[in-house]
UniProtKB/Swiss-Prot annotation:
Gene assigned in the entry: mnmE
Residue ranges annotated for the TrmE-type G domain, each copy included: 220-373
InterPro entries listed in its UniProt record: G_TrmE, GTP-bd, GTP-bd_TrmE_N, GTPase_MnmE, MnmE_dom2, MnmE_helical, P-loop_NTPase, Small_GTP-bd
Protein name: tRNA modification GTPase MnmE
Record-annotated disulphide pairs: none
Amino acid sequence: MSQRSTKMGDTIAAIATASGAAGIGIIRLSGSLIKTIATGLGMTTLRPRYAHYTRFLDVQDEVIDDGLALWFPAPHSFTGEDVLELQGHGSPLLLRQLLTRCLDLGARQAHPGEFSERAFLNGKLDLIQAEAIADMIGAADLRAARAARRSLDGVFSRRCEALAQQLIRLRIHVEATIDFAEESLDTLDRAQIRTSLQTLNVELTQLLRDAEHGKRLCDGLYTVLVGPPNVGKSSLLNALIGSDRAIVTDVPGTTRDTLRESVHFHGLEFVLVDTAGLREEGDAIEREGMRRTLNELQRADLALVVLDACDPQIGSLALADALTSVPRVLWIHNKLDLLTEPPSALDTDVIPVSAMTGAGLETLKTRLRTLLLGETVETIEGEFSARLRHVQALQRTAAHVTDANAQFAYEHLELTAEELRLAYKALGEINGSMSPDELLGRIFSNFCIGK
């Protein structure tokens, strides 16, 4: 159990609504002292799952506030413990006073995410669902919110569990044959195991693609604008976000540092990164800017390579090399307005635009939307939210399944079984069944205090 959770017997309390004045404010409590605290606040009777109008009293029986109290007895609550919600006026002063009174009556201030952590530890949620709560709260658009809702409803969890069961059955089959190691595998057994490994690999590959898609929905597509100096990268960024955020001049090398802006196209989030132009020479400051550009490319989901439509030369060997590791590359020929003749037929991965006039920008936005959504999830109904750690765990799982396939080809049954065990362990990190305590601590510490 994590260090954060060694006091599971404590009763915790926190303000669950956003800071600032509002019409309603909520304090949430969870733990074994709920009835004692309710009595201390002046509530003599509470019926489960009923809204009780009451006055919340201080130690001198003075009224702190009035509002509604709702009691959810264990185990039928969000955390699996006794839960009490106090709904009063959204005055920060009154909420702090009411929270202090709850703490004086025996509760302690909850850590960030501790309510969700208790729900996880008490088996009310798996780790995917707990993270989906935070993803739903932080969603930047409706589609991402709906994807997080599906993860909270268990769409992602059920697919992981189905794969976990396949791994268990397959490992049992392989280990059963080890008991008869003196006999070679018969044709039927060999075919069954090989088919099961192939089926597992196909389904795992599809789940990995869908998880990558879910991560893009939640995080947005990290899109880095790169290219030679003075081709209009900053102008293009300004045109796409509809604001003069980046400095634009005719002097090559004006952009020395990276600039990040979140923007939504067709209801989907993109993180656009303007970078220093890349060329073979430059002063010390410009070279530092170019180094940062190459670093940004290492984390890019997509590179927009911006070139001058009048002279579309990349002009940098370092950029050409760096692009080989970027998952997606889209070529932009900017300054279309300066061409004296219409552009000749271009490759489908090249989009002619003019940051100055806006020509081609809608085509670019549509292409960006297509790149974010991809074709990995057949319907919107199948989308779910995912995080980087989920994708990485699935990648490790897939690598172990691939190794199991290779070991089985040589009839190394013990090694095949071991790779399947490691695959199951990696997959279990996703829903928390195999997650180390320090990972759980990091995940829940990033939640809101009242969640």
